A protein has these predicted regions:
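Beta-lactam-recognizing serine transpeptidase/beta-lactamase-like catalytic domain environment
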Residues: 21-26, 93, 196-244, 249-481
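Periplasmic/cell-envelope proteins involved in peptidoglycan metabolism and beta-lactam response
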Residues: 1-219, 230, 239, 265, ...
Length: 503
């Protein structure tokens, strides 16, 4: 068949139209794909925002809710307190330490059955919303509602109030009563815990106050100067020179620096020591202890020996050691505390190293921290995290939170802990810790007399644990200005040990 020019032209145009249509389809497809891609990006963006919002709400409600509710500046707490009767705070055996009373007119007031006894540990909550201690740290749980949704609606309609959760502490009433009585009128503190778990068994500070009087007497309490402050929890916030209790750290530093021959240590004490370029450090009453090995020098609390040891310590190693023991660091605890301070640097003078070696100079510690160190020795070198809240339960008795022991970390080897235990046991059997020498529970510890001014005034310390071969309790005592033949603090500690072991 003969193809004319017109037919050829038509075929050509048809092919061109098809080609254009194909190209148009390709362009349309590309545009459609681009639009789909843009739509997907936008969709993914909004899905991402939604997921982020869900995550934020979960974190807010699960992780941060307690912190936010516990914040004293959170005004929504006032609204929560209008709907919830604050839960109880209980001792380790369920004894009530804090509860809410309601009078005939429906007015609520917080009641503390033991008055002064737990004023620093349990704390208080005032009519103005001010809170301290466990009342503050556990505010979230104490105001958490137990009721289900229907009960909450019923309460809203009737004007009734839900019951908050109850907080059970690790605190023992009998032990706390004994510690408080042993302190008497002395300023100071007692704190004790289980070395293997970190459970705080007692926490007492003096001067104290009756938590029931917060609404009438608080304005007076805040006028006291720092030395007489009743609001300061000396067990966790009081900073003191550690005195001879710091010889625990000095001894460990020497052991590590002389790991192959520290057991051959020998020092002839004539009552004082002078280091060229340093200063003269004297033993108590300039007592000449004669020849001593490291254990005996520790038991005698020989300043001459330990100031000499301090002067010879490698500064880098020493700094690393006390950093391991959390000096100048935050402590992993859920209550208010002060950081213990250590000032040794590479530029420290010989005199400062001497003073630091015996726990003087610019070293400052809290009883809490001193107890943690003793407890780590008792626990084969593992430092446990101290905690004061055992569990939280709703008003029906259902467990909401159960705290478990956790370790800060290993601060020394088991062998080092064993040697230091031997040193601390010798303090009791033949050294300065004679108050517990004949006690059947066989304690180990370290006494301390810490000079705090230029007038030969001293604080009295004791830190230790019992039994030395199977430790169940670690105790630390500080008596401000309580130095009396280094006996005062150890006698308070003895009372706590006696009570714990049933004597």
């Amino acid at each position: 068949m003969k193809v004319t020019g017109k037919m050829a032209e038509k075929r050509k145009q048809s092919r061109q139209r098809k080609k254009q249509n194909v190209q148009s389809d390709i362009v349309d497809t590309e545009k459609k794909n681009l639009r789909n891609k843009e739509t997907n990006v936008i969709a993914f963006f909004f899905v991402g925002l939604f997921v982020a919002a869900i995550v934020y709400l979960c974190v807010f409600n699960i992780k941060d809710a307690g912190t936010i509710v516990n914040n004293p500046y959170n005004k929504r707490v006032d609204n929560q307190e209008s709907k919830v009767v604050r839960g109880d705070i209980l001792a380790d055996d369920g004894d009530v330490l804090a509860t809410t009373l309601t009078d005939d007119e429906g007015n609520e007031s917080r009641y503390y059955p033991y008055g002064n006894l737990f004023c620093h540990s349990v704390g208080f909550t005032s009519l103005t919303g001010m809170k301290t201690g466990i009342e503050q740290s556990q505010n979230y749980y104490l105001l958490s509602e137990t009721n289900n949704v229907l009960d909450q609606i019923g309460n809203d309609l009737s004007g009734g109030k839900a019951k908050g959760h109850n907080v059970t502490t690790t605190l023992n009433v009998e032990l706390t009563q004994a510690a408080y009585k042993a302190l008497g009128s002395n300023k100071g503190a007692v704190i004790a815990m289980e070395p293997s778990t970190g459970k705080i068994l007692t926490m007492v500070s003096n001067p104290s106050f009756d938590s029931n009087d917060v609404n009438t007497d608080y304005e007076e309490w805040i006028t006291y100067d720092s030395a007489d402050s009743v609001l300061l929890n000396r067990a966790t916030q009081g900073l003191y020179p550690p005195g001879s209790t710091f010889k625990i750290i000095t001894a460990l530093a020497y052991i590590r620096q002389n790991e192959n021959d520290y057991y051959n240590y020998s020092y002839d004490c004539d009552g004082q020591a002078y280091i060229p370029g340093g200063t003269t450090i004297a033993c108590f009453d300039h007592t000449a202890h004669g020849y001593q090995d490291l254990r005996k020098a520790f038991a005698n609390s020989c300043n001459s020996a330990f100031s000499t040891i301090g002067a010879g310590l490698n500064k880098t190693s020493f700094i690393n050691l006390w950093s391991t023991f959390l000096f100048n660091s935050n402590l992993p605890v859920g209550f208010e505390y002060s950081k213990s301070a250590m000032a040794v640097t590479q530029d420290s003078s010989i005199s400062e190293m001497q003073e630091t070696g015996i726990g003087q100079g610019r070293t400052m510690m809290t009883p809490l921290h001193n107890m943690m160190i003793a407890a780590s020795i008792a626990n084969d070198g593992v430092m446990m995290t101290p905690y004061i809240v055992d569990s939280v339960s709703d008003s029906e008795g259902r467990m909401v939170v159960k705290n478990k022991p956790s370790a800060v970390g290993t601060v020394m080897s088991a062998e080092e802990a064993e040697y230091l235990t031997e040193c601390m046991r010798q303090v009791v059997t033949s050294g300065t810790g004679y108050a517990m020498k004949n006690s059947s529970y066989e304690a180990a510890g370290k006494t301390g007399s810490a000079q705090y001014d230029d007038s030969e005034n001293y604080h009295s310390w004791f830190t230790g644990f019992a039994p030395y071969d199977n430790p169940q309790i670690a105790v630390c005592v500080i008596l401000e200005g309580g130095y009396s033949g280094v006996a005062s603090a150890q006698y308070v500690a003895k009372t706590v040990f006696d009570t714990y072991f049933g004597y």
